[in-house]
């Protein structure tokens, strides 16, 4: 059974071996996420090499995503996890040290120290550990813990009521982007996006490195990102709803409504949407998810999210393969009750938000024709990815087989809802149609006498303007004679 909603897996110590990565792929991984808040270029380079070798061997459109560290406040390295309980105190310093309970822990960036005030609430590791500032100095602050937990290396930290303007891109981010371009990665996830100018500035950096069209995913993690969301959505290629930091920056009870709002606007503006953070969190330690987690994933799918993301579950968890299999099972079961018609009507109704009226008119008409004719799939030839992306926006029941000669587009489409990318070296319509039908049969999407709708370009045209209703048998029959 196919799964239209895509799965993103964060790669970490639990899964960065060839054997585990292949198991993740078999379980349902569509995108491999590399979190550049952790690791080095050397360690990420090794993982990238394994992923590229794997996707080449298996001939699959596995995308590789670089997730930037961004302008975040984060702890430094600790010698070993520091166990804390209510009333315990810990020193945070601007000095570069290997952290311990006695020596303290480094806090990055150092520019935040002058802005910290006593009695300010502190949240560590997505809010799991809570503390309060009891002493604030120019290069040192002391916090007192309000609950028990473990302080680990590189964990995120949020200080309430702090008014410091951090730069959107750090020197590390720029170095990481250069590395990502050199490694020919497929997607960039930009952390802590606050406005559309942030996206524009990152595009200029990527252009300077020779990759102006590299897709940028805007991670919405703070109140400014929410406030400027519609402009950010238009400026970016996709959206990630980063619920962890969002639930810290804003009230946690606001997150569900914001998730639905952002998923809807992303879809209406033709941008893919990723729902992330704590989706199957308990599976870091347990082989089965909670009922609430299953409902959370299902609700994200019913919201129309393009992809769901696993973080600690696959990066450092005890049951990474089980987590991906569970996610795929939830997707397949939920999509049985997905209201495809309602999503089509909703997207078709919001004509004011259409980015390309021409493409969308062709796409919407084609979907209606295909469904009325009881077709089993849509086949579309694309050089830029535009046509399948606009088709995906309407959330059709029919799988979209996207045929492309562009390797960058092939991998980039891996994150799009309901799109099954196929790489070809052919531009001849007869040949690529034949290849697409063979691919569809091999993947279990099509059978011999199924009807299909083919989108293609007319002679001299740059955009899709031809719709052909045919059958798999008619396309394949020349080779059977």
From Swiss-Prot:
GO terms for molecular function: ATP binding; kinase activity; magnesium ion binding; potassium ion binding; pyruvate kinase activity. Its EC number is 2.7.1.40. The record marks 219 as: Transition state stabilizer. K(+) binds at residues 35, 37, 67-68. Its cofactor is Mg(2+); K(+). It comes from the Bacteria. Homotetramer. Substrate binds at residues 33, 244-245, 277. This is Pyruvate kinase. Coiled coil: none annotated. ATP binds at residues 35-38, 74, 155. Mg(2+) binds at residues 221, 245. The gene is pyk. It catalyses: pyruvate + ATP = phosphoenolpyruvate + ADP + H(+). It comes from Chlamydia muridarum (strain MoPn / Nigg). Belongs to the pyruvate kinase family. Keywords: ATP-binding, Glycolysis, Kinase, Magnesium, Metal-binding, Nucleotide-binding, Potassium, Pyruvate, Transferase. PANTHER family: PYRUVATE KINASE. Pathway: Carbohydrate degradation; glycolysis; pyruvate from D-glyceraldehyde 3-phosphate: step 5/5. NCBIfam families: PRK05826.1, PRK06354.1, pyruv_kin.
């Amino acid at each position: 059974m196919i799964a239209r909603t895509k799965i993103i897996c964060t790669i970490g110590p639990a899964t960065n071996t060839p054997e585990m990565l292949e198991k993740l792929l078999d379980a349902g991984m569509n995108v491999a996420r590399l979190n550049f808040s952790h690791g080095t270029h050397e360690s990420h380079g090794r993982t990238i090499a394994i992923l590229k070798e794997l996707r080449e061997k298996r001939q699959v459109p596995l995308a590789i995503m670089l997730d930037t560290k961004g302008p975040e406040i984060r702890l430094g390295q600790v010698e070993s996890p520091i166990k804390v309980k209510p009333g315990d105190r810990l020193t945070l310093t601007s000095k570069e040290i290997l952290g311990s309970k006695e020596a303290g822990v480094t806090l990055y960036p150092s520019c935040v120290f002058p802005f910290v005030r006593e009695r300010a609430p502190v949240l560590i590791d997505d809010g799991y550990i809570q503390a309060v500032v009891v002493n604030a100095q120019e290069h040192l602050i002391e916090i007192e813990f309000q609950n028990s937990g473990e302080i680990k290396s590189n964990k995120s930290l949020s200080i309430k009521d702090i008014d410091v303007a951090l730069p959107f891109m750090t020197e590390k981010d720029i170095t990481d982007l250069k590395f990502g371009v050199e490694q020919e990665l497929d997607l960039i996830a930009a952390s802590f996006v606050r406005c559309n100018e942030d996206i524009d500035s990152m595009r200029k950096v990527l252009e300077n490195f020779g990759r102006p069209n590299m897709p940028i995913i805007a991670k919405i993690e703070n109140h400014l990102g929410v406030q400027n969301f519609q402009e950010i959505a238009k400026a970016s290629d996709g959206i990630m709803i980063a619920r962890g930091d969002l639930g810290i920056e804003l009230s946690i009870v606001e997150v569900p409504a914001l998730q639905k709002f952002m998923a809807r606007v992303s879809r209406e503006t033709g941008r893919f949407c990723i729902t992330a953070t704590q989706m199957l969190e308990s599976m870091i330690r347990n082989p089965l998810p909670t009922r609430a987690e299953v409902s959370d994933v299902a609700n994200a799918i019913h919201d129309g999210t393009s992809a769901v993301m696993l973080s600690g579950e696959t990066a450092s968890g005890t049951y990474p393969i089980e987590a991906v299999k569970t996610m795929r099972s939830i997707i397949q079961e939920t999509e049985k009750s997905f209201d495809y018609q309602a999503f089509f009507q909703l997207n078709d109704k919001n004509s004011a938000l259409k980015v390309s009226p021409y493409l969308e008119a062709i796409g919407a008409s084609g979907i209606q024709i295909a469904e009325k004719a009881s077709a089993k799939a849509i086949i579309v030839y694309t050089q830029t990815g535009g046509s399948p992306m606009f088709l995906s926006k309407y959330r059709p029941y029919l799988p979209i087989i996207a045929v492309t000669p562009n390797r960058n587009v092939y991998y980039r489409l891996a994150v799009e809802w309901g799109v099954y990318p196929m790489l070809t070296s052919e531009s001849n319509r007869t040949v690529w149609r034949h290849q697409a039908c063979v691919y569809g049969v091999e993947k279990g999407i099509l059978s011999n006498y199924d009807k299909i709708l083919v989108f293609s370009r007319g002679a001299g045209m740059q955009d899709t303007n031809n719709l052909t209703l045919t059958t798999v048998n008619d396309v394949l029959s020349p080779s059977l004679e």
